[in-house]
Amino acid sequence: MEIQGNRKELMVSKIKNGTVIDHIPAGRAFAVLNVLGIKGHEGFRIALVINVDSKKMGKKDIVKIEDKEISDTEANLITLIAPTATINIVREYEVVKKTKLEVPKVVKGILKCPNPYCITSNDVEAIPTFKTLTEKPLKMRCEYCETIIDENEIMSQILGANNK
């Protein structure tokens, strides 16, 4: 948004139907698209606003995806790389659902323990399970071997899994 005098002007027009993901930490908009599996050839009209000023965050990113409503599963993945994000579902230019993402207390089967000696690395029936220790910065602990992973490891795993 640009402010001229006393009025605000939109940098990007409103979308008729789709999803607006707001309050993404600055520089992570492309990671959000990656998590959603959006490469650019799917036919969705997408707007990215990167490093825009934010009163709450200093700088933030915004992603607008026309004609796509993201699923709960996709929202859960976004939470791990953009825990401050808000997801707005838009229909006929109106926000019909607004969800403030929250880091889950426990994450099962999404992340892998980097410890090669962890039982989850060697037993296919052991489901990797992580408990959130802190949200800022994001740190999680393996429930089996107590290995701690940080935000960088989490992003690396999630983005790596989506590039396969």
From Swiss-Prot:
One of its GO terms (cellular component) is aspartate carbamoyltransferase complex. Zn(2+) binds at residues 113, 118, 142, 145. GO terms for biological process: 'de novo' pyrimidine nucleobase biosynthetic process; pyrimidine nucleotide biosynthetic process. Keywords: Metal-binding, Pyrimidine biosynthesis, Zinc. One of its GO terms (molecular function) is metal ion binding. Its cofactor is Zn(2+). Binds 1 zinc ion per subunit. The keyword Metal-binding applies. NCBIfam families: ATCase_reg. Involved in allosteric regulation of aspartate carbamoyltransferase. Belongs to the PyrI family. Contains catalytic and regulatory chains. This is Aspartate carbamoyltransferase regulatory chain. It comes from Sulfolobus acidocaldarius (strain ATCC 33909 / DSM 639 / JCM 8929 / NBRC 15157 / NCIMB 11770). The lineage of its organism: Archaea, Thermoproteota, Thermoprotei, Sulfolobales, Sulfolobaceae.
